[in-house]
């Protein structure tokens, strides 16, 4: 599948469109969406629109260069590894609130800066599979 139109599904709360050939995704007409899995596509942009209900986002193995999560205060799980982002800011989300045991997966060689919410303590960073998963030059900063 190379295109997906879910604009008529305004009550949609879960969408799994993983492992396709999508290059973009528009969920701007799905304000009730709480869980999105679009892993393993070639997506370079996601249009979230004004919706802010998202709690889980899995967008690993795509071509995303940016991800604006500032309006997703309820987002508690993010899998965005293997994309092309240089900066990732999760400071406005609920990631790290303790709801998920592994709330953040953001392994990518391109990542230079990771912003976390002040008070969230990193318990571990795994680099056992590949030393480039969390690049040694990635700066981790905290925001209030």
Residue locations for each model-derived region?
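LRR N-terminal entry segment and analogous cap-like coil->beta motifs
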Residues: 1-4, 9
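N-terminal capping/linker segments that flank leucine-rich repeat
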Residues: 8-10, 29, 92-94, 110-144
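Canonical leucine-rich repeat
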Residues: 4, 25-27, 46, 67, ...
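Short, solvent-exposed linear patches
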Residues: 8-13, 29-34, 50-55, 71-76, ...
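Conserved hydrophobic beta-strand positions in leucine-rich repeat
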Residues: 13-17, 34-38, 55-59, 78-80, ...
């Amino acid at each position: 599948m190379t295109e997906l139109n879910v604009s008529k599904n305004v009550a949609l709360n879960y969408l799994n469109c993983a492992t396709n050939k999508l290059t973009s995704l528009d969920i701007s007409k799905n304000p009730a969406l709480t869980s999105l899995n679009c892993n393993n596509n070639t997506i370079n942009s996601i249009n979230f629109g004004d919706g802010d209900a998202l709690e889980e986002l899995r967008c690993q193995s795509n071509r995303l260069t940016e991800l604006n999560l500032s309006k997703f205060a309820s987002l508690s799980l993010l899998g965005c590894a293997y994309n092309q982002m240089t900066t990732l800011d999760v400071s406005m989300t609920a990631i790290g609130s303790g709801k998920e045991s592994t709330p953040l997966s953001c392994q990518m060689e391109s990542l230079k800066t990771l912003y976390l919410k002040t008070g969230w303590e990193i318990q571990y960073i795994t680099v056992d599979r590949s030393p480039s998963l969390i690049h040694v030059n990635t700066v981790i900063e905290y925001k209030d």
